[in-house]
């Protein structure tokens, strides 16, 4: 079963405009009941482009890539719904400390105080 806090590779194409596309890591942010019963998942895309100014809706994490940990940004300002058919394979489970940061950034992204 796919669980909240897991990171998977997913095919995000096709896209429009400034959306993140291609095959890239995504963080599952949907609750586990939804993950179990829904044909879709709510995810946040992840990028290795960490050279720009970080926003309060972004969380820096290290995720495995090519047998080493790579600094990456979870883009919680770009959350989207994907069909489960777009999910390719699991990369890792995010640490609980990082999920606390994700929850804070998600609140900012959707305007929850």
Give the ranges of each region predicted by the language model.
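Conserved functional hotspots at enzyme active or ligand-binding sites that engage polyanionic ligands
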Residues: 1-113
């Amino acid at each position: 079963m796919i669980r909240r806090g897991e990171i998977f590779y997913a095919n995000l194409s096709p896209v429009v405009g400034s959306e993140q596309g291609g095959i890239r890591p995504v963080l599952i942010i949907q609750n586990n009941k939804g993950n179990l019963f829904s044909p879709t998942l709510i995810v946040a895309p992840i990028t290795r482009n960490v050279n720009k100014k970080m926003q309060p809706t972004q969380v820096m994490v290290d995720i495995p890539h090519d047998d080493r940990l790579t600094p990456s940004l979870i883009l919680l300002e770009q959350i989207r719904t994907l069909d489960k058919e777009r999910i390719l394979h699991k990369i890792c489970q995010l640490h609980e400390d990082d999920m606390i940061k994700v929850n804070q950034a998600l609140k900012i992204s959707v305007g929850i105080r």
